[in-house]
């Protein structure tokens, strides 16, 4: 008995499954894996307190019960939240956030496109508008 029909069927199923896989634009010259590491100091002093966890805002990425709080989060982007994060906790959060960056095409980073009004559907809703301070701070991160 020939295994050719079985191989053909397996290949067809594999190809069918692959057609639904999304693609990611990594830019003309994507950086090697693991090298998308914009300035960590800027992350700690600007991105964390002004974009991810701005004081006085009821809705942000990690507000109480927020989608991206590690303890109770409901998404792949889960961050440690504390009044005073230790250096190790900041480092862990930075490593998590950088998985959602696209250094070849920063404007395509899901870390930006999800909360940005009208770009990507986001379970937490739109958090900031194009041209707003959080978006500009994000782009400044790549310029540093």
Q: What does each model-found stretch correspond to?
A:
Residues 1-21:
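Sec-dependent bacterial lipoprotein signal peptides
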Residues 21-144:
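Aromatic- and Gly/Pro-enriched helix-to-coil junctions and flexible linker segments
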């Amino acid at each position: 008995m020939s295994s050719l029909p079985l191989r053909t069927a397996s290949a067809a199923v594999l190809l069918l499954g692959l057609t639904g896989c999304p693609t990611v634009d990594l830019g003309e010259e994507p950086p090697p894996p693991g090298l998308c590491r914009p300035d960590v100091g800027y992350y700690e002093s600007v991105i964390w307190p002004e974009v991810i966890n701005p004081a006085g805002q009821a809705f942000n990425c990690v507000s109480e019960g927020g989608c991206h709080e590690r303890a109770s989060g409901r998404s792949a982007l889960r961050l440690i939240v504390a009044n005073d994060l230790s250096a190790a906790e900041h480092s862990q959060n930075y490593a998590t956030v950088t998985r959602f960056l696209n250094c070849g095409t920063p404007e395509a980073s899901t870390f930006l496109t999800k909360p940005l009004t009208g770009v990507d559907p986001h379970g937490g809703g739109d958090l900031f508008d194009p041209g707003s301070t959080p978006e500009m701070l994000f782009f400044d991160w790549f310029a540093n």
